[in-house]
């Protein structure tokens, strides 16, 4: 078969995979069924509400939210350089662990950390893995060494109250490069550890956020990123032996240089950058050291959101963000043949390219959970490697969203995904608006277990990409910065008003929810537009920008001030803080948080709840003693989402 064409695996291969899928499904359900008491484990205080079954559709026809939360998923694939071995993560045990996909198709579990793995990196041959793991959601990850030949797991770098991250193997598989804030809580320096002797050497010492990105094939040069904010970074080439630093991306203003990879001869770097006239992130080939840039997909109107180059420099793969959908592209750089997998309608992500010309990636859609796929650039073969369980739920019940655009107060078009329950009769129904975090995140048509549950229970859902979202270029992402913060909250109101004006919902029967920055946006919308919303769910959200900046992890403060404004401007920060105006909130509020959250400290939840109660408002809280920035454990998610659906039913379905 010619290059650039796509061929699915045979029926026999699918049949074999189905056997593995059945085992995966059994393992996932068994792990959840035999988990300890979720209330006891979570440390949460929960008060029962009216059951969904008492009011909603026939409970025999619609599976419970607990069943929906047990639908599986796989992520973070990596492939050995020769393309022979694939690794991935899945939470079939209740938390994320690292697995190796054996040649028989069996997923072999490599790690068994109590609170799961945070990240991992496979060596070139696939014989060694470095894994980061933390406890209680603290994000203070220690490093562990996994020998895939012996299956032994041993400590590599253990430090109390220190965050390690961004591990990178040397080509000879002896050294691991990583970032750490062990010397000063606010600065990440770069270190090298000898996996044989355990000796550690600091090789990069600059204030702020620094991380190793890529290493040359001879092991002598390291590509380093220094981040000034979430929308601005600089790349350097470090000579490891001499310490000489060569700036690769000097610039003025806010620009991104991401996913950078070195060519084997060190003559060029491939990267994704928005340093161009229209501010759209695209793939560039940048000469070293002259700095001359050539854009490889310069004609594309869409943002490039991921890119990877094989270690031999022959194969390139990238993902283009087509209005929220992620389309995978792959190119043989030797003969120029390119493939576009646009028929896969959903989101491709987490790509990793081997020197054998294989691309492993995650694919999911609104109706299919995330699984690992492999594409062979040379042969055009496309294969699904994992088959996540649907927990016994009929996939045909799931609903795809419609991409719509509504106009905000100043004429700006706001893209959004509109979900309607099957058979919607054209009359107003209870609606939920879901606001993404970041704030530079983006709402995508990804698989959402609780979205599909709500749809089957008669809810509609609107997921907007308000100004400040990524995926639409440099100008759009900057529209909510600093003193423009409340313009993005107005975008949310205009979305709710659009639902009412078009007959989808009634004013006062629209719920709003969001996590992290989306939690702030939820609270701010309830403050500024109290009559149109009937319920709010704040998940690990910011309530007070002053206390948030004072108490967030030190290494995050400067990055966040670049977005929200300096702590010195406390008058403005307090004015846009929901806790300042808690008396305006009319809708019942559910606040969810993790006790160990290093990003948005739990004090944000407690002060917001206290402020609402002091003013006679209705507020309930759910604080997980063993979580951080979001509920990561299945046992806690079961508690959270049961509480969520009962809260929404109680306040939006009356």
Language model features: what each stretch is:
Residues 1-14:
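N-terminal secretory signal peptides that target proteins for export/translocation
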Residues 17-33:
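Bacterial N-terminal signal peptides
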Residues 46-62, 85, 89-109, 128, ...:
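Beta-propeller blade-edge and WD-like acidic-aromatic loop motif
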Residues 71-89, 114-132, 143, 160-179, ...:
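Conserved beta-propeller blade repeats
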Residues 386-425:
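N-terminal cap/lid segment of alpha/beta-hydrolase-fold proteins
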Residues 420, 427-437:
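Short beta-strand element of the alpha/beta-hydrolase
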Residues 445-464:
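Short amphipathic alpha-helix adjacent to the substrate-entry channel of hydrolases
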Residues 464-654:
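Active-site-proximal cap/loop segments of hydrolase catalytic domains
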């Amino acid at each position: 078969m010619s290059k650039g064409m796509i061929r699915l695996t045979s029926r026999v291969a699918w049949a074999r995979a189905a056997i593995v899928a059945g085992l995966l499904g059994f393992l996932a359900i068994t792990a959840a069924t035999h988990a300890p008491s979720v209330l006891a484990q979570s440390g949460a205080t929960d008060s029962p509400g009216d059951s969904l079954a008492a009011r909603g559709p026939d409970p025999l026809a619609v599976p419970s939210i607990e069943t929906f939360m047990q639908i599986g998923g796989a992520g973070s694939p990596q492939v050995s350089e020769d393309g022979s071995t694939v690794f991935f993560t899945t939470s079939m045990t209740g938390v994320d662990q690292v697995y190796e996909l054996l040649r028989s198709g069996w997923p072999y579990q490599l790690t068994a950390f109590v609170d799961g793995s945070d990240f991992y990196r496979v060596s070139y041959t696939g014989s060694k893995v470095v894994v980061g793991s933390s406890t209680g959601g603290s994000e203070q990850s220690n490093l562990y060494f996994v020998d895939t030949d012996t299956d032994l797991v041993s400590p590599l770098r253990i430090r109390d109250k220190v965050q390690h991250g961004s591990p990178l193997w040397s080509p000879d598989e002896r050294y691991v490069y990583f970032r750490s804030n062990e010397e000063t809580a606010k600065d990440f320096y770069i270190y090298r550890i000898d996996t044989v002797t355990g000796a550690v050497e600091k090789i990069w010492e600059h204030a702020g956020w620094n991380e190793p990105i890529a290493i040359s094939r001879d092991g002598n040069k390291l590509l380093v990123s220094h981040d000034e904010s979430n929308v601005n970074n600089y790349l350097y080439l470090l000579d490891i032996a001499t310490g000489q630093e060569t700036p690769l991306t000097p610039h003025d203003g806010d620009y991104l240089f991401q996913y950078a990879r070195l060519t084997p001869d060190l003559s060029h770097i491939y990267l994704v950058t928005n340093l161009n006239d229209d501010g759209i992130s695209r793939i560039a080939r940048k000469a070293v050291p002259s700095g001359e840039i050539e854009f490889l997909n310069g004609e594309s109107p869409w943002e490039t959101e991921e890119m990877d180059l094989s270690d031999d420099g022959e194969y390139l793969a990238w993902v283009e963000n087509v209005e929220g959908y992620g389309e995978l592209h792959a190119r043989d750089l030797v003969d120029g043949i390119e493939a576009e997998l646009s028929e896969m309608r959903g989101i491709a992500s987490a790509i990793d390219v081997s020197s054998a010309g294989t691309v492993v990636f995650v694919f999911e859609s609104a109706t299919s959970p995330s699984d690992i796929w492999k594409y062979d650039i040379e042969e055009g073969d496309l294969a699904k490697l994992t088959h996540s369980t649907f927990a016994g739920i009929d996939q045909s019940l799931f609903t795809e969203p419609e991409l719509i655009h509504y106009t905000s107060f100043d004429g700006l078009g706001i893209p959004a995904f509109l979900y309607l329950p099957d058979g919607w009769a054209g009359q107003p129904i209870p609606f939920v608006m879901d606001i993404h975090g970041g704030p530079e995140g983006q709402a995508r048509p990804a698989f959402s277990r609780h979205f599909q549950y709500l749809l089957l229970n008669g809810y509609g859902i609107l997921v907007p990409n308000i100004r400040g979202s990524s995926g639409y270029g440099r100008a759009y992402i900057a529209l909510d910065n600093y003193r423009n913060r409340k313009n993005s909250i107005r975008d949310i109101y205009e979305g709710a008003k659009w639902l009412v004006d078009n007959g989808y919902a009634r004013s006062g029967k629209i719920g709003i929810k969001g996590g992290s920055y989306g939690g702030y946006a939820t609270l701010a919308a309830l403050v500024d537009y109290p009559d149109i919303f009937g319920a709010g769910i704040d998940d690990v959200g910011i309530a007070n920008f002053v206390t948030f900046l004072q108490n967030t992890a030190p290494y995050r403060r400067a990055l966040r001030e670049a977005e929200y404004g300096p702590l010195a401007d406390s008058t403005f920060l307090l004015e846009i803080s929901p806790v300042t105006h808690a008396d305006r909130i009319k809708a019942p509020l559910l606040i969810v948080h993790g006790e160990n959250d290093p990003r948005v400290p739990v004090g944000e939840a407690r002060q917001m709840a206290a402020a609402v109660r002091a003013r006679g408002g209705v507020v309930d809280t759910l604080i997980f003693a063993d979580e951080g920035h979001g509920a990561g454990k299945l046992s806690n998610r079961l508690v959270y989402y049961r509480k969520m659906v009962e809260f929404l039913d109680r306040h939006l379905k009356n």
